[in-house]
């Protein structure tokens, strides 16, 4: 009866849903909880002893522990003694209560319920199970799984990350399962991947040939388990305590000088943020082309490695792969520069994103003119693939070349600051003009067309950019030379391929190639001065006008506008430019002066400095442009010797000090001092002498009006003594009046008035009394 009384509590808290066991085993993502789901058949057919069950269970969990253990095993030794005692008591209870597991399982099979808190239970006897599991061999894992699942018991609720499930029975006491999170530490490690690599066929559903499904299922499992466990973590004290101990151990390691992994490194924070726990997803981009890296990733995944070491190892593999790929592309492009591209020859056409990444890496690891040659060749190969499209659309011969070249070159130069000028110059109009016929290129710098597009070549723009960055000249000059050679070679080959190109154009390109090589041999120092243009203002005007163009215009409309502009420029050239027989005085308008002193030059010098460009069979536009640069160089050298720069007031000194000049200077100084003394003395005398007569004059001036006033006063007649008589009469009257007052008679009216006043006073007093009462 004791068992029957306790049945409802066990069935309510049972963590197993027996109807879902087979469905969960067929899922591709094999969760750790599936190890501890108990089937009905295994519970009824089990006949092993409790000790063998405990050993098989510990063997299974030891195998899981070996697969999932990270190098923070010091954490296990730092557990408190109270937990060890509790684990021993729980182990003794487990041996007594395992006898009732079959009855409880039979009852639970009738009332199947699903435990929502199965993933946060904790087993305090994990250490005793671990010690017993060491006695059994590892090979007993597949056979002991069915028996070990019977003895898994349920225990009180204690929060943890990845628990294993047990059933409870008997006296009603609950036994907590073992938590793998206590073995693994505070770090959340992906259990699905590592377990699937070590388990045998009864346990693993996925095969080794499905690494992508593994990674997807792994990410799904990590998200679900982390979302469930994080809901109960705030109230738990276990993980926080383990974390503090782990940090304490790492601090001790740091004090001893031992290497310790950084717990707050960028890699771990990134993995926590994205939910990635293993190296499998890092090796995914390489898996597309190199299948050997998958095996290397599996081998490295079996060993416990520091995440930083894994990161560096993967970075080294990627670097080696990029170098191998760049060498392969370089060999393919050098063997057949006009053949198919290296991406299409392999039979596999990778996506656009890895191609961008590869070219960007190639620019990082392979600096210098060699990488530039390979990139230009890749561009040319990409354009060669579009030749059938050119044959189908003869009216649009440059559109597809524009799209291919801009994609490759713009992505190849994003990470290098020294090639920022190339990035600015690689707009569609310019790249399309690189492969246009020669007469179109010859109109780029001469005229500003009405549609205001940006007619500047890559070499010219980079040379102008070198004026602002003279520190990087030595490195970028090689880049300019290689670019100019590449453009000339492309022009030469395209003029051979285009039958519509005239003989004049091909001759001019060949002359360019010959003269460029001879000038590089004869004049190596000319390159730096060539970059200093005086027509930079014109180039910047074209640049600003090109930026103001609306970006929404379609490439077809742009191409049609460009063709019309070239035709108009050709007509203007034929009208303005002289032929060979014409007079040499007819030239282009003068270039804007950059220095104020150049206005002092004579008209003959300014005519000499102007660029004389004529359309002839023997000379091309680029050759004539270089001639103009030479003239500009000469003019810049001469402009430094003009009168405006010279200070003609300065007199050069002799070989030593001149005594005569020093004596003359000393005499002048002495004379100046003497003259100053004389002037001072004269001024002092002049100031002291006129001060005395001034005082006398002032005294005389003040005395004169006084005397005049006295004389005038004497002339005034004296007044009569009337005032004195009045005063005497007054004095006489006052005593008589005082005597009269004593003798005056009494006035009757005054007495009447006084009596009346007294009566009125009494009346007023009576009114006051009446008013108060």
UniProtKB/Swiss-Prot annotation:
Residues 216-229, 598-610 have a biased composition (Low complexity). Keywords: Cilium biogenesis/degradation. Residues 353-369 have a biased composition (Basic residues). Residues 59-84 have a biased composition (Acidic residues). Residues 29-43, 112-134, 728-743 have a biased composition (Basic and acidic residues). Residues 10-28, 48-57, 145-154, 334-351, 500-516 have a biased composition (Polar residues). Disulfide bonds: none annotated. The keyword Aminoacyl-tRNA synthetase does not apply. Residues 1-247, 325-373, 496-526, 596-615, 713-743 are annotated as: Disordered. Coiled coil: none annotated. Pfam families: JHY. GO terms for biological process: axoneme assembly; brain development. PANTHER family: JHY PROTEIN HOMOLOG. Required for the normal development of cilia in brain ependymal cells lining the ventricular surfaces. This is Jhy protein homolog. The gene is JHY.
């Amino acid at each position: 009866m004791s068992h029957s009384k306790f049945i409802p509590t066990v069935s309510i808290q049972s963590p197993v849903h027996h109807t879902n066991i087979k469905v969960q085993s067929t899922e591709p993502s094999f969760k750790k909880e599936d190890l501890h789901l108990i089937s009905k058949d295994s519970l009824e057919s089990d006949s092993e002893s409790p000790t063998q069950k405990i050993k098989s269970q510990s063997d299974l969990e030891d195998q899981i522990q070996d697969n999932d253990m990270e190098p923070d095993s010091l954490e296990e030794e730092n557990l408190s003694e109270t937990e060890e005692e509790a684990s021993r008591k729980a182990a003794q209870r487990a041996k007594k209560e395992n006898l009732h597991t079959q009855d409880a399982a039979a009852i639970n099979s009738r009332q199947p319920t699903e435990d929502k808190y199965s993933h946060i239970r904790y087993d305090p006897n994990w250490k005793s199970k671990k010690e017993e599991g060491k006695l059994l061999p590892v090979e007993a894992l597949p056979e002991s799984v069915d028996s070990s699942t019977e003895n898994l018991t349920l225990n009180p609720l204690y929060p943890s990350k990845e628990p294993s499930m047990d059933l409870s029975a008997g006296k009603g006491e609950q036994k907590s399962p073992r938590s793998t999170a206590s073995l693994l530490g505070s770090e959340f490690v992906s259990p699905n991947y590592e377990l699937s690599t070590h388990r045998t066929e009864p346990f693993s559903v996925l095969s080794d040939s499905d690494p992508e499904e593994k990674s997807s299922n792994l990410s799904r499992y990590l998200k679900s388990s982390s979302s469930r466990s994080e809901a109960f973590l705030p109230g738990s004290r276990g993980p926080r305590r383990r974390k503090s101990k782990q940090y304490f151990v790492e601090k001790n390691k740091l004090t001893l000088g031992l290497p310790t992994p950084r717990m707050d490194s960028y890699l771990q924070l990134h993995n926590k943020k994205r939910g990635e726990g293993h190296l499998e997803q890092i090796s995914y981009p390489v898996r597309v082309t190199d299948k050997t890296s998958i095996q290397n990733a599996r081998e490295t995944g079996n060993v416990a490695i520091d995440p930083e070491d894994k990161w560096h190892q993967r970075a080294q593999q990627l670097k080696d792969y990029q170098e191998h790929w760049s060498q392969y592309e370089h060999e393919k492009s050098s063997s057949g520069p006009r053949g198919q591209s290296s991406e299409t020859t392999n039979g596999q056409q990778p996506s656009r994103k890895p191609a961008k990444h590869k070219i960007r890496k190639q620019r990082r690891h392979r600096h210098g003119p060699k990488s530039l040659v390979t990139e230009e060749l890749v561009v040319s190969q990409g354009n060669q693939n579009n030749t059938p499209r050119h044959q189908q659309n003869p009216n649009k011969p440059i559109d597809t070349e524009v799209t291919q070249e801009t994609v490759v070159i713009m992505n190849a130069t994003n990470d290098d600051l020294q090639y920022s000028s190339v990035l600015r110059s690689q707009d569609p109009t310019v790249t399309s003009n690189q492969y246009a016929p020669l007469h179109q290129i010859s109109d780029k710098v001469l005229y500003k067309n009405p549609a205001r597009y940006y007619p500047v070549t890559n070499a010219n723009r980079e040379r102008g950019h070198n004026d602002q960055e003279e520190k990087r000249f030595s490195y970028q000059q090689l880049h300019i030379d290689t670019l100019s050679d590449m453009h000339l070679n492309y022009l030469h080959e395209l003029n051979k391929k285009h039958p519509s190109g005239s003989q004049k154009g091909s001759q001019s390109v060949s002359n360019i190639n010959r003269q460029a090589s001879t000038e590089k041999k004869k004049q190596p120092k000319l390159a730096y001065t060539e970059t200093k243009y005086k027509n930079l203002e014109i180039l910047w005007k074209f640049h600003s006008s090109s930026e103001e163009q609306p970006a929404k215009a379609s490439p077809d409309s742009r191409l049609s506008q460009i063709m019309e502009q070239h035709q108009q420029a050709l007509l203007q050239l034929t009208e303005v430019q002289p032929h060979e027989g014409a007079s040499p005085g007819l030239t282009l308008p003068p270039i804007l002066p950059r220095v104020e002193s150049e206005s002092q030059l004579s008209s003959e010098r300014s005519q000499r400095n102007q660029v004389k460009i004529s359309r002839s069979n023997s000379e091309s536009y680029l050759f004539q442009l270089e001639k103009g640069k030479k003239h500009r160089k000469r003019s810049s050298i001469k402009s430094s010797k003009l009168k405006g720069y010279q200070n003609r007031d300065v007199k050069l000194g002799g070989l030593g000090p001149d005594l005569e000049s020093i004596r003359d200077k000393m005499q002048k100084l002495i004379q100046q001092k003497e003259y100053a003394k004389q002037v001072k003395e004269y001024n002092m005398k002049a100031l002291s002498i006129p001060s005395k007569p001034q005082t006398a004059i002032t005294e005389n001036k003040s005395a004169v009006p006084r005397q005049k006033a006295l004389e005038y006063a004497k002339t005034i007649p004296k007044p009569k003594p009337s005032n004195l008589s009045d005063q005497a009469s007054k004095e006489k009257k006052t005593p008589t009046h005082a005597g009269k007052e004593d003798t005056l008679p009494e006035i009757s009216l005054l007495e009447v008035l006084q009596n009346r006043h007294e009566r009125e006073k009494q009346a007023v007093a009576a009114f006051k009394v009446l008013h108060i009462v």
